[in-house]
Amino acid sequence: FASTLSEKDISSSEKISEAMEGFEVADLMELQPRDVVALYNLLNNNLPLIINVNRASDILKLIDIKKLYGLNLILMSAQEAELVKNEIAENKIPVIINPFDNIPDSFDELASNIRISASLEEVGIKVMFSESRTHNYHLIRQGAGNAVANGMSYTGAIMALTSNVAKSFNITDRGILKKGMKAD
């Protein structure tokens, strides 16, 4: 539905409501105008869709969905990404991982291991680091060190904290270590 809309269709809540009339999916999903704008931007403005996924079979399904809809997909967590790393690399999908995750928390993460960042880096996947959203977020730097201790290159770990993030989210004024850029 959102892929059939134009800029004019999403210019106001009234226009969105008019455009939604007759679309059963919009009614079934109880979409609000703000939801339609978000979907429109996702499909038409190349905004990244971040999906928290762990199981290798689910990652492969998401790759199919990415191809079908032309989505700018980013995988989050992706503890079994190592099992399908070639497919992820082939489709140029960045991955956000927690470098401290090294054992399975569920049956969706049975292939979880401490070397995942190094393994993904080896096949050219843009790796980014994240940490559990707690007061310990500052430990992300230590996580980068753990990734290096377990096979990731120093350069890859720095890029996982800086330029890979900037490139994956189309941020042009920061995140790259270069003269004239903001260094946060």
Where are these regions (language model features)?
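Polyanionic/metal-chelating signatures
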Residues: 1-73
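Amphipathic coiled-coil/heptad-repeat helices and related helical stalk/stem segments
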Residues: 35, 55-58, 81, 112-113, ...
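Short acidic active-site motifs
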Residues: 38, 83-84, 116
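His/Asp/Glu-enriched, well-ordered alpha-helical/loop segment
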Residues: 48, 89, 98-102, 106-184
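Catalytic beta/alpha-barrel core
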Residues: 50-54, 72-80, 100-106
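Glycine-enriched alpha-helix->loop->beta-strand junction motifs that scaffold or abut catalytic
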Residues: 66-73, 89-96, 124-126
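Active-site-adjacent beta->alpha loops and helix N-cap segments on the catalytic face
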Residues: 80-90
